[in-house]
A protein has these predicted regions:
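Nucleic-acid-interacting cores, centered on viral/eukaryotic replication and modification enzymes
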Residues: 145
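Nucleic-acid nuclease catalytic cores
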Residues: 148
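Active-site histidine-anchored catalytic micro-motif
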Residues: 131-132
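Short helix/loop segment immediately N-terminal to the Walker
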Residues: 407-413
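Conserved "HGTGT" condensation-loop signature of ketosynthase/thiolase-family condensing enzymes
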Residues: 1-121, 138-142, 152-262, 266-267, ...
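Short coil/turn segments at secondary-structure boundaries
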Residues: 120-128
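Soluble or luminal CAZymes and related metallo-dependent hydrolases
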Residues: 51, 128, 306, 389, ...
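Glycine-rich and small/hydrophobic secondary-structure elements
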Residues: 384-391, 395-399
């Protein structure tokens, strides 16, 4: 296939993370009512495989309503969030269930032949939506197909055929699937704790950055709220940001800045042919990156090597002409390494003279940014159904290029093309992805010089799997001399205050560790940062 043939368009999409009325009704009465609804079979429609099917049927309906001929679609790439843990199904079981529904439905007549259904197993966790998207790109670029569908569903409440739901604590453990098993076992590390520690380190690194991100979060939620008032939001949380309880859940991580558990679906139709007229949106770059599952093995807790690799690869493929052409960014989440890494790489590559903090505070980048409009869909902080999240963000970017779905039309000249970036974070930056879209007049988009190439998922997935296996087998970490205290985080629980902390090595790496409450209480009464500390190979503070 020649370089000029490597063209993929986003033709349309769907998304919906709004909690169904059924869930609101069933959960309002607490666990007893939820159990009763489940035993009566009334919760079936919110199982992950049901959301997947609902997303597909709505995507087909949308394409037909738009007059798009999908009969040449030969593959449907599907996924559900944490299939083993949340849905309690294997990937092949999900695919078989989908195939059965398709064979028995009226929708099969929309296709010349029954499409194959693919569900690629992955460790990508919260970034897993980029995997079926990447598979669809490979369908079109490497397997000479003309159209490919991407559909994902998820229910992070854990409602499935075997149970009415799981507890938030169990969900937190599942979300930590890409955190080093050794760190989880000995330091009780998880996503919230690592996120809080990273935020604490960011406070020390650049307090103005935190102020910028807080303002950014408020503006994102406000924009989502305004879309919802007009009935146009696909998000889960759409309340006014000032009505959201600004409660610290793990110091200094606040409720308003975190992504709520969600249920819903998202889908896209990708094709090698553009729309017959008007504006077109094309995929021009995609990248992936993986990093060590333990922060002990990373050069920095604030800058994501995985995200940097993903963004850099996507940029090389997309061949943006300059900073002025980058108009839209949809961040997976706003705290803190996603925008810090993503924007650092983008702004440096495109010649911006200033820091990420300056770009945000000066409103060069923001929801109403002078140069780049960022985070208008709200990202994961307004609803995180895991696998569908990246697909929803891609759909929101698509709508912004078309000036549809409540987004104002971009001010583009007749031959001008705008670019947009979408980030996807797996775990605490263990498995990240990035995509770049281009939008504009059909003829201008068609002639772009891009070098789109799907990433090698099997390679990245294998690297991650080997790392997780090695961490699971680890009996003791190598602890360097000269460690000092970096940051102490804590949360209030029914059993009392629970602590989590990181120690810093002389070369700048962070080690998670735990100690007794009395040890941390004494330290918090002092200016503890930089205090010498010793920790054991199993990440316990040597007290006394």
């Amino acid at each position: 296939m020649g370089q000029t043939d490597r063209v993929v368009y986003v033709r349309t999409g769907v998304a919906n993370f709004k909690p169904p009325p059924l869930w609101e009704l069933a959960s309002a009465g607490g666990s007893k009512t939820l159990q009763e609804f489940w035993e009566a079979g009334k919760l079936r429609e919110i199982y992950a495989e049901e959301f997947l099917w609902a997303g597909f049927t709505r995507l087909v309906t949308e394409t037909l309503n738009q007059g798009i001929d999908i009969s040449r679609t030969t593959t449907i790439n599907v996924a559900v969030s944490y299939p083993h843990e949340m849905a309690q199904m294997r990937e092949d079981e999900v695919a078989e269930d989908f195939c059965r529904r398709l064979a028995e439905s009226e929708y099969r007549t929309a296709f010349r032949q029954t499409p194959r259904v693919r569900f690629t197993p992955t460790h990508a966790a919260s970034a897993s939506g980029i995997v079926p998207f990447n598979d669809a790109l490979a369908d079109l670029l490497e397997r000479d197909e003309k159209m490919s569908m991407v559909v994902a569903g998820g229910n992070t409440k854990g409602t499935n055929r075997n149970r009415p739901r799981i507890s938030p604590a169990e969900t937190t453990d599942i979300f930590a699937s890409l955190v080093s098993p050794f760190d989880r076992r000995h330091a009780k590390a998880n996503m919230l704790k690592l996120g809080a520690a990273a935020l604490g380190r960011a406070y020390q690194h650049d307090f103005d950055l935190i102020k910028a991100l807080e303002r950014f979060i408020h503006a994102q939620r406000l924009y989502t709220h305004e879309l919802a008032r007009r009935g146009l939001s696909t998000a889960h949380i759409t309340t006014h940001p000032d009505s959201i309880e600004d409660r610290t859940i793990l110091h200094p991580l606040k409720l308003r800045g975190t992504g709520p558990q969600s249920m819903g679906y998202a889908g896209l139709l990708l094709a090698t042919q553009p729309p017959p007229a008007g504006r077109a949106v094309r995929v021009v770059g995609i990248g992936c990156g993986v990093d060590a599952s333990s922060i002990r093995d990373r050069p920095s807790h604030l800058f994501s090597q995985a995200m940097a690799s993903a963004v850099s690869t996507a940029l090389v493929q997309a061949r943006l002409p300059g900073l002025g052409s980058l108009k839209v960014l949809e961040h997976h989440n706003p705290y803190p390494a996603v925008p810090l890494t993503e924007l650092t790489v983008l702004l440096k590559a495109l010649g911006y003279r200033g820091s990420v903090t300056q770009a945000l505070l000066q409103n060069d980048i923001g929801v109403h940014g002078r140069m780049i409009c960022a985070g208008r869909s709200g990202g994961a902080q307004v609803g995180h159904a895991i696998t569908p999240t990246f697909i929803r963000l891609t759909f929101e970017t698509f709508k912004q290029f078309l000036g549809a779905g409540g987004y104002p039309a971009l001010d583009l000249g007749p031959d001008e093309v705008a670019y947009g970036g979408i980030s996807s974070v797996g775990g605490h930056h263990t498995f990240d992805g990035y995509a770049i879209l281009a939008g504009g007049r059909r003829e201008a988009v068609a002639t772009l010089d891009a070098a789109l190439e799907p990433f090698d998922h099997d390679h990245f997935n294998g690297v991650t799997e080997r790392d997780l296996e090695e961490q699971a087998a680890l009996t003791g970490a190598v602890i360097p001399d000269g460690m000092t205290l970096g940051f102490i985080s804590f949360q209030e629980t029914k059993e009392g205050r629970e602590y989590f902390a990181i120690a810093r090595t002389p070369d700048g790496r962070d080690f998670p560790f735990v100690a007794s409450p009395a040890f941390f209480t004494r330290l918090l009464e002092t200016a503890y940062i930089g205090t010498p500390i010793r920790i054991s190979p199993t990440l316990q503070a040597v007290e006394g």
